[in-house]
From Swiss-Prot:
The complex is composed of two ATP-binding proteins (MetN), two transmembrane proteins (MetI) and a solute-binding protein (MetQ). Residues 8-250 form the ABC transporter domain. This is Methionine import ATP-binding protein MetN. One of its GO terms (cellular component) is plasma membrane. Part of the ABC transporter complex MetNIQ involved in methionine import. Responsible for energy coupling to the transport system. It catalyses: L-methionine(out) + ATP + H2O = L-methionine(in) + ADP + phosphate + H(+); D-methionine(out) + ATP + H2O = D-methionine(in) + ADP + phosphate + H(+). The gene is metN. The keyword Plastid does not apply. One of its GO terms (molecular function) is ABC-type D-methionine transporter activity. SMART domains: AAA (SM00382), NIL (SM00930). Its main location: membrane. The keyword Transport applies. It holds the Pfam family ABC_tran.
Length: 354
């Protein structure tokens, strides 16, 4: 089992502005293992960006303890390292942002080389390092181009190469794909996954989009008003969300909310017969492989009219959603619901026939 490379224990961050006290982060505990791609998701004002500054050691917490790669860096708001040791710890963390922050008058390779200006490498070693980094992010042929000659995705690749220049163990992505189109976003996420595998890089994804979490992360924390309200594996959170905000994020990411809007306009749903109901079925793992709807028809004479279906692969495990109209005798539908529950399917009744 991988050990935690980032440990935030009971972190409070409070700001004082004149007569106001702002509790930006309240009693947050997060442990991120080596090699994780860990998502922190929430709307604006949730405390995500403040938490980023704690993780990359730019913000001292008011209370709580921070341990990075085995070293306690802050405890009860007090720094535990020398200034030099803290600077070195900060170099162990790379950052990429929504805005690429490239220097317009420098080429791609010069932008990457700028991150090595304090390195002990020789000039030749730095040149080789820059070439290797641009190859790693798939941009070696654009080494001599200026930012104005690059697309948004290419600029972000330069920013990633620059963030990796000092061989960090941790990479923080703070809304790094928010300014990109969907196709380019997928390409950048695929690159980050590749870097995670190749380098053993621990990646922290700060985002307001659960779709990003679904596509790339293995664990996720959901924040609201400075509080961590839910945390777990992506599989557990998507298949069994507990909090209303988490459920809202997930229905948006999976397209269920949009599907329901359209389904509710269909005549079959507007005029459900008395012996029918509209239900959402959620299932994960082996239950996705079972012909359950055929089974409940054979056993209970309950028909299932599928109005929507979707299967995602999360952390190598299939997770599915279906919206169906179940029709049959009332006692048979109850028996079918029980059988579905026993097979590991979560059944939510959305509407009953009149």
């Amino acid at each position: 089992m991988n050990e935690a490379i980032i440990q935030l224990d009971h972190i409070d961050i409070t700001f004082r502005q004149k007569k106001r006290v702002i509790e930006a982060v309240k009693d947050v505990t997060v442990h991120i293992n080596q090699g994780d791609i860990y998502g922190i998701v929430g709307y604006s004002g949730a405390g995500k960006s403040t938490l980023v500054r704690v993780i990359n050691l730019l913000q001292a917490p008011t209370n709580g303890k921070i341990t990075v790669d085995g070293d306690v860096t802050f405890d009860q708001g007090k720094i535990q390292l020398s200034a030099n040791a803290l600077r070195q710890k900060r170099r162990d963390t790379g950052m990429i942002f929504q805005h690429f922050n490239l220097m317009a008058q420098k080429t791609a390779k010069e932008n990457v080389a700028f991150a090595l200006r304090h390195s002990s490498l020789s000039k030749t070693e730095k040149e080789h390092k820059v070439i290797e980094l641009l190859e790693l992010v798939g941009l070696s042929e654009r080494a001599d181009n200026y930012p104005a000659q690059l697309s948004g995705g290419q600029k972000q690749r330069v920013a990633i190469a620059r963030a990796l220049a000092n061989d960090p163990k941790i990479l923080i992505s703070d809304e790094a794909t928010s300014a990109l189109d969907p196709k380019t976003t997928k390409q950048i996420l695929a690159l980050l996954q590749e870097l995670n595998r190749k380098l053993g890089l621990t990646i922290v994804m700060i985002t307001h989009e659960m779709q990003i979490v679904k596509d790339i992360c293995n664990r996720v924390a959901v924040m609201q008003n400075g509080v961590l309200i839910e945390e777990g594996s992506v599989l557990d959170i998507f298949s069994n969300p507990k909090e209303a905000l988490t459920q809202k994020f997930i229905t948006t990411a999976t397209g269920i909310d949009e599907a329901l809007e359209k389904i509710n306009q269909q005549d079959i749903v507007k005029h459900l017969p008395a012996n029918a109901l509209l239900a959402q079925l959620k299932y994960a793992g082996t239950s996705t492989d079972e012909p359950l709807l055929n089974s409940i028809y054979r056993q209970f004479e309950v028909t299932a009219n599928i109005l929507y279906g979707n299967i995602e692969i999360l952390d190598h495990i299939p997770v599915g959603d279906m919206i169906v109209v179940l029709e049959g005798q009332a006692e048979n539908i109850l028996a079918a619901e029980k059988a579905l529950h026993e097979a590991g399917v979560d059944v939510s009744i959305l509407k009953r026939g009149a």
